[in-house]
């Protein structure tokens, strides 16, 4: 009593406390960063190594394996995967959430240093690492185009100057430049001319390397001057290399230009990038795992004027893709939804109370509670994102509940003629315990979420804390500011003048009278109600098992990502044509705004595309509908497939795949994996629950297998090293020398001129100079035959791995897909030497599925413990929790009705319902216990009176929560995929719960009271309850 009086009789102090909470919240709001979702990125580091010309198998065994053995010893590694292709190895290290990315980077560098002695010689550089996840979609893509500059020159400018500047911006983790390669001097050898002159390829290589050196020459000085010595020991352009003497044939000088074409070209000619059908250089910018995407994008945009100022006029720099506009639009939609929810909740209060003054009280309590929450969010390091703003939207209905309960009880005393200050004090005292019970039990629901680990726990923690803080502030406001405002703003009414008898009040009285009549009938037919209650319990179990499930709602971010997979024997020229064909098909779609793509590098038969869709307001279809439409057109392209998927704000794992979900096969036997992977992939492709099934196992690439006759080689005076060096010189794009320039270093690349290597007959023109100086044709000591070889070799951990990726057809849930895969694997009878498991998002979904029921049970148990402590009773918490089955039925039926799968967002809705619907029972039980204790009523009389007295606040709080969630259901636009499942779950659960719990709760109350009496008689011990 004294606590409440302290605030009621000191209005200035109470107002200033509320003002302080509001001001702190406003300051916190201005400082909060903006993001699509809470920070849930796993720390990921990518290690890259290269050995030009080495086969995928050689890269896997000689480069990947030594690095993996060293990197695998690092503490906190959650998953390690590697992919080795022609001349390139990439290892992805995914760390635990609690691992600091900078500390992990130091450990990675130490592991690379430790493995250095085990790596093969001839690597052009040491392995490097980047603190970025290559499987993440870029947050921004910049393109460089020019009518006069070559692609190599553009690439050089982009990688040397632009990429370096962008990489220094806070939050940027990696700037990947694609579409070409660095400039280089290319030496294209003529095998016939070399043979005629008696010049070996090694001789050419050594001559070029010897002629292009950079060594210190020293200085000369006398007593007065000092002269630094500088020579023309470096050759920098193709024109300088052409007259280079590489051999003497019968005293005549043989120059490089006599036996080769020497051109200023690029280091790797098998690269191509395009934007909207124009050749382009792409700068794909990815953020650091812990960086904020909006702040990073804003930093890049702020730097663009400076970047454009340093770019020559002949270059055009454009933003091809930016993920921030859809994120900002989504957050704006949530903020509008929040405002609508506040307005609807206040409207509900006004309709019930029909008083401007009375309505003003919760109208003040709601913003104070919500705004004050921003201060706590800032102190906790949170951001303004879809989930935290959704928490505040839902909190609108919660925070007004406390004020409504207090306000309604005070208004009831005022209507009975009590003076305002006395009514405020008496009314607050009566419901103070009720409000505390409601708030503490609601916060208790979220305690298991705060203890939940992994990605789901990290994702939901921000939602749970934000909502709990809002409820906590609301509790304080409802017991301090609300009664003070009631005492000083409201007026007493004459006992017989009941304003509720007009308009909505008359309807409410009629409803209350009808409820009283029906409740009497129900209390006389408790067995029927008991059957209904048990039926809802059983229906919950059946619906939960039957409803389709997924991990997270499929988002429409306005960005699509596509992976091209062509025939494994395709040439680069043909692959570039496929890229152009696919880009034309997509560019012609009316919903597409921009298309960029690239192909080449170490994987000639693959490519990537990034598609920016028009804003949601300018197109009718969702991203998935656009993918379905494009899939039909893209399937008509022969010799290659383009797999499209919508970019999501959450992507789990560092494994790159051509679809949203992955199933990984592991084996210690590469042969077993290659035998079973095609069988499994074929079986999964036939499943109607899967779409776009593809695999990263590519072991049917065309290979020419050369078989040396070692006896003949020995007789001819040729060793294997000389033969292998010949092949590397001729066909490996061998980097034989380095050109040093002020801004960068460039390579001299040697190979047989492509004009002379169009087919296998090029091998017949190859020759080796033996120990006697004679030219011996390759065909004299080697035979060749066509064979199949892998284009890539993949590992997970230290096991051979193959990942089958898949998308979901429209109308199929992830649970249906995973069940179909598990069933198919069982039917195939896969041997134990081949192990299968889900990866990435599908793996997290499986883990979440296993913990969902445990989480719900833990939440219910926590609420039971809190209520048991508050009521000092084992029984009354069970009565209160009896409201949950009906809410669960309503939520699951609503999801089925709207064809929405049960996702992590729907799970949040179920958790919220556990906290919401028990409020009705708390209000009933509190008043029933008080009536029994002070009024001497029987349990039946007490619960009946409690139901009638609390009918109005129950209706008000339920409708407030319902209207607070309704905008989430009706909202459209960006981000609605996240909001709607939460709103559907809450609205469905509230409607069903309100219909049933008004009757089941009093019946359960009486059932447990009778049970308590029977138990008391048997034990002859009094049960003390408050």
From Swiss-Prot:
An example molecular function term from Gene Ontology annotations: xenobiotic transmembrane transporter activity
Cell compartment(s), UniProt: Cell inner membrane
TM stretches of this protein: 15-35, 333-353, 360-380, 387-407, 431-451, 463-483, 528-548, 853-873, 897-917, 953-973, 984-1004
Isomerase is among the record's keywords: no
Subcellular location, principal: membrane
InterPro entries: AcrB_DN_DC_subdom, Acrflvin-R, Multidrug-R_MdtC
A UniProt-annotated Pfam family: ACR_tran
Membrane topology reported for the UniProt record: Multi-pass membrane protein
GO cellular-component term (any): plasma membrane
Keywords attached to this entry: Cell inner membrane, Cell membrane, Membrane, Transmembrane, Transmembrane helix, Transport
Assembly, per entry: Part of a tripartite efflux system composed of MdtA, MdtB and MdtC. MdtC forms a heteromultimer with MdtB.
Family: Belongs to the resistance-nodulation-cell division (RND) (TC 2.A.6) family. MdtC subfamily.
NCBIfam families: PRK10614.1 (NF007905), RND_permease_2 (NF033617)
HAMAP family: MdtC
Protein name: Multidrug resistance protein MdtC
Gene: mdtC
């Amino acid at each position: 009593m004294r606590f409440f009086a302290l605030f009621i009789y000191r209005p200035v102090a109470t107002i200033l406390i509320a003002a302080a909470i509001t001001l702190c919240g406003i300051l916190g709001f201005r400082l909060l960063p903006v993001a699509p979702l809470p920070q849930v990125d796993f720390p990921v580091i990518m290690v890259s190594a290269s050995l030009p010309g080495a086969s995928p198998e050689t890269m896997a065994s000689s480069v990947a394996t030594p690095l993996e053995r060293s990197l695998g010893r690092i503490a906190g590694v959650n998953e390690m995967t590697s992919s080795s292709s022609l001349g390139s190895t990439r290892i992805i290290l995914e760390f635990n959430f609690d691992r600091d990315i900078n500390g992990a980077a130091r450990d990675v560098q130490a592991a690379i240093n430790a493995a250095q002695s085990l790596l093969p010689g001839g690597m052009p550089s040491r392995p490097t690492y980047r603190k970025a996840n290559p499987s993440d979609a870029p947050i921004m893509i910049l393109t460089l185009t020019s009518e006069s500059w070559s692609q190599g020159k553009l690439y050089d400018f982009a990688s040397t100057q632009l990429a370096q500047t962008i990489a220094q911006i806070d939050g940027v983790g990696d700037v990947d430049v694609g579409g070409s390669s660095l400039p280089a001097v290319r030496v294209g050898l003529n095998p016939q001319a070399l043979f005629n002159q008696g010049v070996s390829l090694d001789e050419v290589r050594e001559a070029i390397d010897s002629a292009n050196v950079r060594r210190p020459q020293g200085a000369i000085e006398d007593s007065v001057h000092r002269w630094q010595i500088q020579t023309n020991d470096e050759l920098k352009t193709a024109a300088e290399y052409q007259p280079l003497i590489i051999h003497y044939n019968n005293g005549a000088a043989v120059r490089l230009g006599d036996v080769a074409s020497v051109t200023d070209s690029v280091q790797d000619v098998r690269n191509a990038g395009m934007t909207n059908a124009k050749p382009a250089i792409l700068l794909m910018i990815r953020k650091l795992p812990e960086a904020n995407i909006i702040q990073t994008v804003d930093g890049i945009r702020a730097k663009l004027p400076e970047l454009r100022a340093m770019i020559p006029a002949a270059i055009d720099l454009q933003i091809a893709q930016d993920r921030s506009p859809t994120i900002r639009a989504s957050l704006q939609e949530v903020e509008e939804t929040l405002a609508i929810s506040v307005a609807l909740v206040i409207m509900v209060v006004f309709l019930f109370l029909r008083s401007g003054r009375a309505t003003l009280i919760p109208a003040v309590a709601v913003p104070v509670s919500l705004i004050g929450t921003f201060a706590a969010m800032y102190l906790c390091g949170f951001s303004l994102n879809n989930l935290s703003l959704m928490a505040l939207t839902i909190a609108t209905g919660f925070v007004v509940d406390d004020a409504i309960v207090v306000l309604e009880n005070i208004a009831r005393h005022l209507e009975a003629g009590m003076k305002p200050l006395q009514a405020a004090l008496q009314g607050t005292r009566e419901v103070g315990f009720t409000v505390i019970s409601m708030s503490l039990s609601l916060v208790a629901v979220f305690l298991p979420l705060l203890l939940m680990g992994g990605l789901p726990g990290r994702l939901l923690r921000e939602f749970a804390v934000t909502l709990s803080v809002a409820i906590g502030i609301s509790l304080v406001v409802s017991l301090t500011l609300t009664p003070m405002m009631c005492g000083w703003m409201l007026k007493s009414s004459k006992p017989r003048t009941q304003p509720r008898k007009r308009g909505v009040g008359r309807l409410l009285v009629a409803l209350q009278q009808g409820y009283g009549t029906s409740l009497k009938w129900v209390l006389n037919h408790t067995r029927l109600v008991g059957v209904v209650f048990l039926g809802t319990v059983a229906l919950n179990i059946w619906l939960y098992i039957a409803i389709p499930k997924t991990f997270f709602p499929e988002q429409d971010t306005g960005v699509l990502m596509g992976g091209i997979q062509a025939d494994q024997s395709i040439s680069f020229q043909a692959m570039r044509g496929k890229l152009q064909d696919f880009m034309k098909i997509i560019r012609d779609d009316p919903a597409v705004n921009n298309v960029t793509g690239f192909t080449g590098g170490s994987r000639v038969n693959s490519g990537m595309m990034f598609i920016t869709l028009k804003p949601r307001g300018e197109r009718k279809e969702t991203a998935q509908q656009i993918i379905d439409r494009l899939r039909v057109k893209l399937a008509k392209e022969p010799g290659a497939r383009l797999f499209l998927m919508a970019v999501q704000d959450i992507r789990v794992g560092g494994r790159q795949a051509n679809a949203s979900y992955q199933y990984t096969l592991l084996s210690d036997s590469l042969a077993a994996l290659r035998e079973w992977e095609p069988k499994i992939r074929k079986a999964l492709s036939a499943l109607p629950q899967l779409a776009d099934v593809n695999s990263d196992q590519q072991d049917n690439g065309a290979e020419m297998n050369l078989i040396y006759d070692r006896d003949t080689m020995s007789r001819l005076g040729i060793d294997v090293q000389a033969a292998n060096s010949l092949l590397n010189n001729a066909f490996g794009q061998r980097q034989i020398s380095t050109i040093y320039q002020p801004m960068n270093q460039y390579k001299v690349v040697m190979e047989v001129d492509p004009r002379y290597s169009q087919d296998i007959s090029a091998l017949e023109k190859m020759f080796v100079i033996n120990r006697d100086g004679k030219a011996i044709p390759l065909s004299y000591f080697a035979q060749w035959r066509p064979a199949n070889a892998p284009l890539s070799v993949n590992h997970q951990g230290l096991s051979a791995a193959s990942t089958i990726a898949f998308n979901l057809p429209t109308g199929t849930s992830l649970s249906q897909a995973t069940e179909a895969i598990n069933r198919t694997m069982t039917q195939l009878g896969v041997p134990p030497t081949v192990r299968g498991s889900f990866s990435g998002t599908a793996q997290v979904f499986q883990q979440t599925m296993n913990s969902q029921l445990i989480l719900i049970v833990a939440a219910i148990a926590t609420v039971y413990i809190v209520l048991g402590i508050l009521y000092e009773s084992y029984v009354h918490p069970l009565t209160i929790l009896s409201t949950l089955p009906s809410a669960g039925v309503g939520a699951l039926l609503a999801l089925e009705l709207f064809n929405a799968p049960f996702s992590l967002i729907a799970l949040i809705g179920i958790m919220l319902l556990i906290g919401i619907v028990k409020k009705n029972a708390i209000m009933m039980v509190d008043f029933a216990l008080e009536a029994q204790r002070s009024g001497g009523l029987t349990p039946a009389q007490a619960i009946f009176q409690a139901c009638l007295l609390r009918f109005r606040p129950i209706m008000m709080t339920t409708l407030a929560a319902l209207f607070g969630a309704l905008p989430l259901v009706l909202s459209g636009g960006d981000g609605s995929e996240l909001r709607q499942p939460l709103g559907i779950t809450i609205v469905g659960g509230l409607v069903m719960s309100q219909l049933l719990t008004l009757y089941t709760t009093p019946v359960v109350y009486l059932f447990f009271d009778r049970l308590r009496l029977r138990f008391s008689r048997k034990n002859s011990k009094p049960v003390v309850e408050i």
